[in-house]
Design a protein with these regions (language model features):
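Short, basic/aromatic recognition patches
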Residues: 1-12
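A generic local secondary-structure boundary/capping motif
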Residues: 6-7, 33, 105-110
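Short beta-strand segments
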Residues: 10-47, 65, 76
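Short, structured beta-strand-loop surface elements
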Residues: 52-98
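Helix-rich interaction surfaces within compact, conserved domain-sized segments
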Residues: 95-109
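Conserved small/polar residues in nucleotide/adenosyl-binding loops
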Residues: 126-131
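Leucine-biased recognition of intrinsically disordered, low-complexity hydrophobic segments
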Residues: 134-135
Length: 136
């Protein structure tokens, strides 16, 4: 599903968006710094502050994300399904280390606390038609 051509869009150069929906249909869109590559069928989001997103996902495990390739400006849409959360291990440690580095560089040490690495299955990944039209 996730190919080499998608990797630049998963490096965190441009913010990404995640949209979730509560069980009663109320949507919530949040801008996030990065969507992490886990393997060709999974991505992870850092769970820090997203209380509304986390609540929505507990009610409805499906989400929609958009990532952007910084070199081509192509946008890719990902249809996701929550799989599991990790609160320790290699993925969690890698995400926590990067989060702490970002906090340190922005003068926000101690503000960001990674609570979990939320892992999602990528159900569908496709190019945004609007980006294709803009890029010709």
């Amino acid at each position: 599903m996730i190919k080499d051509k998608h990797m630049p869009a998963l490096q965190g150069m441009f913010p990404s968006w995640i949209t979730s929906c509560s069980s009663d249909g109320e949507p919530n869109t949040t801008v996030i710094s990065q969507i992490w590559y886990v393997d060709e069928n999974h991505v992870a989001l850092s769970f820090q502050f997203f209380n509304k997103t986390k609540k929505n996902i507990s009610e409805n495990p499906y989400a929609y994300a958009t990532i952007s390739d910084p070199s081509t400006l192509k946008q890719y849409n990902l249809e996701l399904k929550f799989d599991h959360e990790e609160t320790e291990g290699e993925l969690f440690d890698e995400m926590d280390m990067k989060l702490q580095a970002i906090a340190s560089m922005t003068g926000m040490t101690g503000i960001f606390k990674l609570r979990a690495a939320d892992v999602y299955k990528v159900c569908l990944l496709y190019t945004s038609d609007a980006a294709d039209e803009l890029l010709g």
